[in-house]
Amino acid sequence: NIKKRNDKINELNNYLSLMCSGNFDLDIMDNSEGEMSILKNNLYKIMTLLKTQNEQLNTDKLYLANSLADISHQLKTPLTSMMVMSDLLKDEKDEGKRNEFLSIIETQLDKMKWLITNLLKISKLDAGATEFKHEKFNIAPILEKSLKQFYVTCDVREIEIVNEINDFEFVGDENWTGEAIENIIKNCIEHTNNNGKLRFFSQKTNVYNSLFIQDNGCGITKEDLPHIFERFYHGKNSSSESVGIGLALAKTVLEKEKGDIIVNSELGKGSIFELRFYKTIV
């Protein structure tokens, strides 16, 4: 009995050594009875947990590497443009040309600022470093506030804004909901031609209230549709101004509020984004 017990202890010790070296593919389940079997099965549970955590860690490392590559690429493009414009400015005497180059540099700086700001926001959401308020708000004032910053752009491009919403209450965070709405509006404007139309309307059900944001732009292909909320994703019809972070941020915000964003689109006819606010947590 003592020999058998020592053999089992040595066996468990070997399993522990293999686990410490990173081997989590051991078949150590034991269906027999006894204290050693209980210990062995508990060891198996720990091994399974460590294996899952290790796989998640590798996934996170890969995601981080890909994200850093994407961020680097997104920053490299405007930086390259600014460097070119800066070199041209050194030798350019024409005041009109100089102002044109400075305008391009300013545009690229705004693009970089927007990217960095939104990356910081989405990082805070990922890290759980942001506390979401759960208060009652009306959607109409939030939409109006979000729309204000796009009035000039829509006016210049002659994009018609049609606001047909019936106001409703929802429980959430006013500022973060505004962020989500702004990013969807920005996306719709980027993919809508001059003389286009943006339409806002709402729908109420017993379970949720919805805000719809509709454009009559280029639409989204069936292949791209399942991926548009992925970070840094660029579809076939992506705008040159798009960095692929706005819709991901909007989706994250709605999910944090226990809501959802649903999109329907038809190529060449436009897209409809539905922001769904549940009346009770589901």
State each model region's role.
Residues 215:
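Acidic ATP/Mg2+-coordinating residue in the GHKL
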Residues 127-132, 165, 169-172:
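Conserved micro-motifs of the catalytic ATP-binding
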Residues 133-148:
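A conserved beta-strand-to-alpha-helix junction within the catalytic ATP-binding
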Residues 107-112:
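Short alpha-helical segment of the dimerization/phosphotransfer core of two-component systems
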Residues 187-189:
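Short helix-loop "hinge" at the ATP-lid/N-box region of the Bergerat-fold HATPase_c
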Residues 220-233:
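Short conserved segment of the HATPase_c
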